[in-house]
Every structure is written in structure tokens, then in C-alpha cells.
């Protein structure tokens, strides 16, 4: 199973808990200790940076969490391994370890300095969500109206050059349109759903989805109740199925993956543990989804994308 987004690593939601072992904290939804033993798991661990952290403060915030990520990679090395690409992930799985990818949620970590793209790539960052909800040096999130800045466009080009995946989750519609003019390689939406089924601006329009399919991009289904249904009343995996089928109908059978948003959002009871998330597979099969397509959503689509786009 491959999950393209969680907020488990950073301590923003659990301030002052006194537990630096964020990856195996019993107070968190996602823990190394509660991942199903019979499932090979790969996880994108995002360093979420609040919008108010800018410049040197954003760099310091990232550095604190980056150091803690690698400290935990060493402490829990019998259960988890840091990964940069598909080969690393497959090696971790062969050793019965969780495959951990370091990512960033909010391009403010660049602090407006294009040379930091290379620095972050060297530090093992594999994806950067260009914006969070508000504005940063790269552009605007879904609560604002501006698109990508000139620096944002330059950053996209540099990320592609350095092998860091460009993540458009949180980017507003204007910014998405700007990105299409700049991006030369497949990009990702690590945790976004279909706006046709849930009208929140964080979700992708049908035109966006079609364009991402055309460009061989990757999209992770988000479990947040308010991104699954307008009323937020999610009581079964039927809403995951509905979004899955909508993506399939738009040609996305090879583009759809999972992006839980564990420890960063309000989850429905049916998806509030890793074991319950793993049950998505059986549910899709029970609703008539083929084994090939269910495997694609759970891991194969992301695995193939990594093989082609992560070096």
C-alpha cells in the first residue's frame, strides 16, 4: 500500500506533547506500531509548514522536522527505511520495513531562494506541495485568487531538474492553469478528490483530472470528510468508491492512488486507522472493481509512477 500524504511527522497538531517520536506516537492516527503486519506500506511523510512561517523561520521549521525524521529513521531502523525512489521502496518491502519518503507541504520552505531546491533534493525531499491554503513566495493556495509567481514558475522548472515531484494539492485554479504552461514532466496531487462529487475548492475539476490523466500524472484520494462529501457525513467506504469510479470514468484508472491526510484532517470512522484504510482494497473488489484496478489504486499506479519519475 502506498500513501501519498500524511501530517504525522510534523508536531504542529500535537504541540507540547513532549514526544519527539512522531512516527510511533500512540496519540497519532498513523503509527509504525499500528500499520497492518500483512501489508507492505510506503508513506510520504510531509513536513507541514504553517503559512505564517516565512523566510528564515520557514527554513528553521523545516530543518527541525527534517532532523527529527532522520533521527527516527535510525531509531526505528528495524521497522522503517528512508527512500528516494522505487528501488529503495522495493528493498524496504523485501526487508519487511515501511518505506518512508520525506516530503514538504508548503513551498515556503524555499524561502524565496531558488538554490534551496537543490539543497532540499540533496537532503532527500521527494515532493513539495507548492502552496498551502494561503500565499507564499511561489503562489497562492485555494483561499486566495492569484496564480503562480514568477519565482513559483522558476521553482517548478528547478524541481523538475532536481527530481523533486511537483505537488498541486492546495494550489488554486489560477495557479493550476499557470502550472500547465510551465510543467514539462508529470506532476502529482498527493491528497485531492473530485470536485464534481464534492464542491470544495481543494478538489480537482474534471478538466484538471483529464489533463492530469493526459500527462500521466498521479492523484491521491484524500480521506478528509469535507473533501469526500459536501455535508461531511461520511459513514462508509461508499464515498471512496464514488470518487474512485469518477476518476476511472475520466480515464484515470492508471493515475489514481491514495493520499490519506492521516493526522492532518478529520477522518471518518471507517478510515481512522491504517488497518481500516487497507480495507479499501476488499471494499473496491466487493463493489465490482477488478483486481487489476484495485491493485492500481492501492499501490501499483504509484509504484509505476515512482519507477518513471523518482530517481
Stretches with model-predicted labels:
Residues 272-311:
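Mid-to-C-terminal alpha-helical segments outside catalytic/metal-binding sites
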Residues 68, 246, 250, 297, ...:
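Short alpha-helical scaffold segments that flank and stabilize functional sites
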Residues 48-50, 264, 299-304:
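A short, acidic, flexible beta-alpha connecting loop/helix-capping segment that sits on the rim
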Residues 223, 251-274:
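Short acidic/histidine-rich active-site segments
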Residues 1-222, 226-228, 241, 245-248, ...:
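Extended, charged catalytic domains and RNA/DNA-binding interfaces, predominantly
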Residues 56-57, 230-233, 266-271:
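Second-shell loop/turn segments in exported
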Amino acid at each position: 500500500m502506498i500513501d501519498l500524504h500524511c501530517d504525522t511527522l510534523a508536531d504542529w497538531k500535537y504541540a507540547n506533547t513532549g514526544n519527539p517520536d512522531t512516527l510511533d506516537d500512540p496519540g497519532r492516527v498513523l503509527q509504525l506500531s499500528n500499520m497492518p503486519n500483512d501489508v507492505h506500506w510506503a508513506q510520504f511523510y510531509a513536513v507541514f509548514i504553517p503559512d505564517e512561517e516565512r523566510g528564515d523561520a520557514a527554513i528553521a521549521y523545516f530543518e527541525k522536522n527534517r532532523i527529527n525524521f532522520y533521527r527516527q529513521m535510525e531509531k526505528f531502523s528495524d521497522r522503517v527505511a528512508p527512500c528516494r525512489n522505487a528501488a529503495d521502496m522495493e528493498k524496504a518491502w523485501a526487508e519487511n520495513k515501511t518505506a518512508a519518503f520525506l516530503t514538504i507541504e508548503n513551498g515556503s520552505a524555499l524561502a524565496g531562494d531558488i538554490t534551496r531546491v537543490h539543497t532540499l533534493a540533496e537532503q532527500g525531499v521527494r515532493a513539495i506541495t507548492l502552496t498551502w491554503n494561503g500565499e507564499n513566495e511561489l503562489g497562492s493556495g485555494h483561499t486566495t485568487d492569484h496564480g503562480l509567481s514568477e519565482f513559483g514558475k522558476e521553482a517548478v522548472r528547478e524541481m523538475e531538474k532536481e527530481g523533486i515531484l511537483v505537488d498541486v494539492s492546495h494550489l488554486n485554479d489560477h495557479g493550476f492553469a499557470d502550472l500547465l504552461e510551465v510543467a514539462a514532466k508529470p506532476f502529482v496531487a498527493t491528497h485531492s478528490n473530485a470536485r464534481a462529487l464534492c464542491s470544495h475548492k481543494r478538489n480537482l475539476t474534471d478538466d484538471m483530472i483529464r489533463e492530469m490523466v493526459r500527462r500521466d500524472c498521479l492523484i491521491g484520494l484524500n480521506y478528509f470528510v469535507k473533501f469526500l462529501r459536501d455535508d461531511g457525513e461520511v459513514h462508509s467506504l461508499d464515498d471512496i468508491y464514488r470518487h474512485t469510479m469518477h476518476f476511472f470514468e475520466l480515464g484515470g484508472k492508471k493515475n489514481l492512488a491514495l493520499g490519506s491526510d492521516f493526522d492532518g484532517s478529520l477522518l471518518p470512522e471507517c478510515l481512522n486507522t491504517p488497518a481500516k484504510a487497507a480495507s479499501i482494497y476488499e471494499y473496491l473488489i466487493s463493489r465490482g472493481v477488478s483486481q487489476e484496478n484495485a491493485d492500481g489504486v492501492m499501490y501499483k499506479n504509484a509504484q509505476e509512477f515512482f519507477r518513471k519519475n523518482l530517481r
